C-alpha cells in the first residue's frame, strides 16, 4: 500500500495516535493530527512527533474533515461521532489502526478475542512460543499498538495479537491465520444495540479464514460454539465435557489432540494459573501455540511458572486474616461471575463505576449465594443498589479509600474482600490499571496500619 502524499487525518494523540503519526510520516503521508485536549496538556506526545512535518489541530471538538484521503480514529474515539459519520457518507474511508496495520502485516498472524481472558491468553501464547524457540511479537489491544510492531516483524516468526470488538469493527481486512474466540458475555451494550450485535462483531475475527486456517472456539459458550461455520479448521475446547479432539478437561488434566497429532496431557496440578476460567484460557493458548509449532515439553515448563497478569483476580494481601483480591479488570458481569465462583468463602464485594448498559441482574443469583455484603461506589452505585436490593447488605461509599475501609470493617477472619467492579473505571480513574493500583496501595496502607 502506497501512502506517499496521501492526506490522512489521525484522531487522538495518545499512544496509538503517536504511533500512527510516526508510521504514516515515515511513509511520506501528509498527516494532520487532531485532539480535543489543549496543546499544553499534550506536551509529551507533541514532543514525540516533533520534526515529522505533522500538522496539529488541537483543542478542537469538531475538526475539518473534508478533503482527506483517509481518516484514522484512535481506539478510544466514539465511532458514532456525527462528523465521522458525515465523512463516511461522503466516501472518505474511516479505518482503525488495526485496519491500516493489516495492509502491512507480512508474518503469520495469531489473534485472540473474547469478552474476558484475552490478555492472559494472548500473553500466554507468546510465552509458549518463545519457550519453544520461536519468535513471536505480542501486541494489539494488550498495550503495544500493532502499527508499532511492524518495524520489527522481519525479526519475528509470528504476530500474536489481542483484538477487541472495537478493533474488529474498524478492521474489515484483518486476516489471522489462526484465531481463538474465548467467550461472549454481555459487555459494551452502551455501544452495541444487542448481545447478538456484539457477537456479530466478535465473529468478524473469522471473516477471511481459509480452509487450512484454524478457528479455536469455546464449546461451553453457546454463542461462541455456533461460530464454526464457513472455511477453516475448527478446534473446540471445553472445561465441562470430554471431546474426541481439540482440548478438554478430564481426570485432573488438560487433554489436547490436534488433527492427527498424538494426544498430549497437561496435569492441572502442574499449572500455576488457578480457576476454571484460567484453565479455559490455557486450553485456547495451548491450541494456538501447538498448532503454530510450539513444543509440548516447553509448554509444560511455561505453565508451571506463568502466574497470570495484574488486576485479574490478583491476591494483594491478608489483613487481620481477611484476604484482599484485586479484580479491577472485571469490568462486566461475566467477569464478576467468574471471580465470585472462584471463592468458597464469604465475599465482601466492592463494585461500581461507569455503566456500560450492563444487565446486572444476570449475576443476582451469585450475589445472593456468595456475597456477604456489597460495598458500592461510582456512578452506578444507585442503580446497583436497586438491582441487588435484598440480596445482601449494601453499603454505599464516596470513593475507593472508603470502600476498602468499610469492606475491612465488614469482613471477618477467613473471609474475602474482592474488588470486581462490573463496570468501567472512567468515572473515577484513568483506566482499570489505575483503579487496581489505587486499590492495592490502599490495601497495603491498611495492612501497615494494622
Regions found by a protein language model. Give the residues of each.
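Nucleotide phosphate-binding/pyrophosphate-handling subdomain across enzymes
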Residues: 2-7, 17-27, 135, 266-371
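N-terminal leader/targeting and accessory segments in enzymes
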Residues: 1-96, 100, 449
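Short internal beta-strands
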Residues: 30-37, 215-219, 350-351, 370-379
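Short beta-strand "acidic-cap" motif of Rossmann-like dinucleotide-binding folds
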Residues: 31-35, 137-138, 160, 236, ...
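C-terminal helical cap/extension that packs against the catalytic core
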Residues: 44-47, 54, 361-415, 450
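Phosphate-binding loop of NTP-binding sites
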Residues: 25-26, 47, 64-66, 75-219, ...
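Beta-strand->loop->alpha-helix junctions that form or flank phosphate-binding loops
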Residues: 32-36, 57-60, 95-99, 231-249, ...
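Residue-level signal for inorganic ion chemistry
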Residues: 24, 71, 112, 141, ...
Amino acid at each position: 500500500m502506497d501512502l506517499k502524499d496521501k492526506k490522512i487525518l489521525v484522531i487522538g494523540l495518545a499512544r496509538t495516535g503517536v504511533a500512527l503519526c510516526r508510521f504514516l510520516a515515515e511513509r511520506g503521508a501528509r498527516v494532520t493530527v487532531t485532539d480535543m485536549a489543549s496543546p499544553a496538556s499534550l506536551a509529551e506526545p507533541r514532543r514525540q512527533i516533533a520534526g515529522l512535518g505533522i500538522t496539529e489541530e488541537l483543542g478542537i471538538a469538531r475538526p475539518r474533515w473534508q478533503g482527506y484521503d483517509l481518516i484514522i480514529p484512535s481506539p478510544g474515539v466514539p465511532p458514532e461521532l456525527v462528523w465521522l459519520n458525515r465523512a463516511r457518507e461522503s466516501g472518505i474511508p474511516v479505518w482503525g489502526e488495526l485496519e491500516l496495520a493489516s495492509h502491512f502485516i507480512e508474518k503469520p498472524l495469531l489473534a485472540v478475542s473474547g469478552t474476558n481472558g484475552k490478555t492472559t491468553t494472548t500473553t500466554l501464547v507468546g510465552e509458549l512460543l518463545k519457550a519453544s524457540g520461536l519468535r513471536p511479537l505480542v501486541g494489539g489491544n494488550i498495550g503495544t499498538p500493532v502499527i508499532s510492531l511492524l518495524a520489527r516483524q522481519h525479526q519475528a516468526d509470528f504476530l500474536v495479537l489481542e483484538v477487541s470488538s472495537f478493533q474488529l469493527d474498524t478492521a474489515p481486512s484483518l486476516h489471522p491465520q489462526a484465531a481463538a474466540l474465548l467467550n461472549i458475555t454481555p459487555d459494551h451494550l452502551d455501544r452495541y444495540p444487542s448481545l447478538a450485535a456484539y457477537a456479530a462483531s466478535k465473529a468478524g475475527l473469522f471473516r477471511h479464514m481459509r480452509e487450512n486456517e484454524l478457528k479455536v472456539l469455546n464449546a461451553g459458550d453457546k454463542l461462541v460454539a455456533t461460530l464454526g461455520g464457513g472455511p477453516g479448521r475448527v478446534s473446540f475446547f471445553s472445561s465441562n465435557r470430554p471431546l474426541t479432539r481439540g482440548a478438554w478437561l478430564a481426570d485432573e488434566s488438560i487433554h489436547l489432540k490436534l488433527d492427527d497429532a498424538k494426544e498430549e496431557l497437561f496435569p492441572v496440578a502442574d499449572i500455576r494459573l488457578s480457576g476454571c476460567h484460567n484453565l479455559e484460557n490455557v486450553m485456547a493458548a495451548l491450541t494456538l501455540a501447538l498448532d503454530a509449532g510450539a513444543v509440548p515439553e516447553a509448554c509444560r515448563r511455561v505453565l508451571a511458572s506463568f502466574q497470570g497478569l495484574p488486576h485479574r483476580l490478583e491476591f494483594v494481601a491478608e489483613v487481620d486474616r481477611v484476604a484482599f483480591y484485586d479484580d479491577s479488570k472485571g469490568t462486566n458481569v461475566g467477569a464478576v461471575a467468574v471471580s465470585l465462583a472462584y471463592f468458597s468463602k464469604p465475599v465482601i464485594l466492592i463494585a461500581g463505576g461507569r455503566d456500560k448498559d450492563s444487565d446486572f441482574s444476570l449475576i443476582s443469583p451469585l450475589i445472593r449465594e456468595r456475597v456477604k455484603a456489597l460495598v458500592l461506589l461510582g456512578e452506578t452505585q444507585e442503580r446497583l443498589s436497586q438491582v441487588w436490593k435484598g440480596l445482601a447488605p449494601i453499603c454505599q461509599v464516596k470513593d475507593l479509600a472508603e470502600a476498602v475501609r468499610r469492606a475491612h470493617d465488614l469482613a471477618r477472619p477467613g473471609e474475602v474482600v474482592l474488588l470486581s467492579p462490573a463496570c468501567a473505571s472512567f468515572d473515577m480513574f484513568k483506566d482499570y490499571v489505575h483503579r487496581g493500583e489505587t486499590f492495592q496501595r490502599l490495601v497495603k496502607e491498611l495492612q501497615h496500619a494494622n
